[in-house]
From Swiss-Prot:
Purpose of the protein: Involved in iron-sulfur (Fe-S) cluster assembly. May act as a regulator of Fe-S biogenesis.
GO CC terms: cytosol
Protein's UniProt keywords contain Protein biosynthesis: no
Record-level GO BP terms: iron-sulfur cluster assembly
Organism superkingdom: Bacteria
Species: Shigella flexneri
HAMAP family given in the database record: CyaY
Gene it is expressed from: cyaY
Protein name: Iron-sulfur cluster assembly protein CyaY
UniProt cross-references to InterPro entries, sorted A to Z: CyaY, Frataxin/CyaY, Frataxin/CyaY_sf, Frataxin_CS
PANTHER family per the UniProt record, alphabetical: FRATAXIN, FRATAXIN, MITOCHONDRIAL
Higher taxonomy: Bacteria, Pseudomonadati, Pseudomonadota, Gammaproteobacteria, Enterobacterales
UniProt key word Electron transport: no
Keywords recorded for this protein, A-Z: Iron, Metal-binding
């Protein structure tokens, strides 16, 4: 994968997250902001999830209250380089815990 393809795929990931949060019907207030290639999800309780791209490594990094995760693209899925879990699984787990209600991105 070259740098431009990586940025296209990361942009697509950011857009999907933003659209899913805009479309959700949950009770808690969840805000999403993109600034300089960093996506920040802020929850009603003040906690945050930070998602950024690491261009030199062609990775997406996810920082949550539970820890930090690094994802490589394998096929059409972003996969954690330590646990083998998908980006969507870990994001949903963290968002659900931090929101105090089920948050789905799929």
């Amino acid at each position: 994968m070259n740098d431009s393809e990586f940025h296209r795929l990361a942009d697509q990931l950011w857009l999907t997250i933003e659209e899913r949060l805009d479309d959700r019907d949950g009770d808690s207030d969840i805000d999403c902001e993109i600034n300089g290639g960093v996506l920040t999800i802020t929850f009603e309780n003040g906690s945050k999830i930070i998602i950024n791209r690491q261009e030199p490594l062609h990775q997406v990094w996810l920082a949550t209250k539970q820890g930090g995760y690094h994802f490589d693209l394998k096929g059409d899925e972003w996969i954690c380089d330590r646990s083998g879990e998908t980006f969507w699984d870990l994001l949903e787990q963290a968002a659900t815990q931090q929101a105090g209600e089920t948050v789905s991105f799929r």
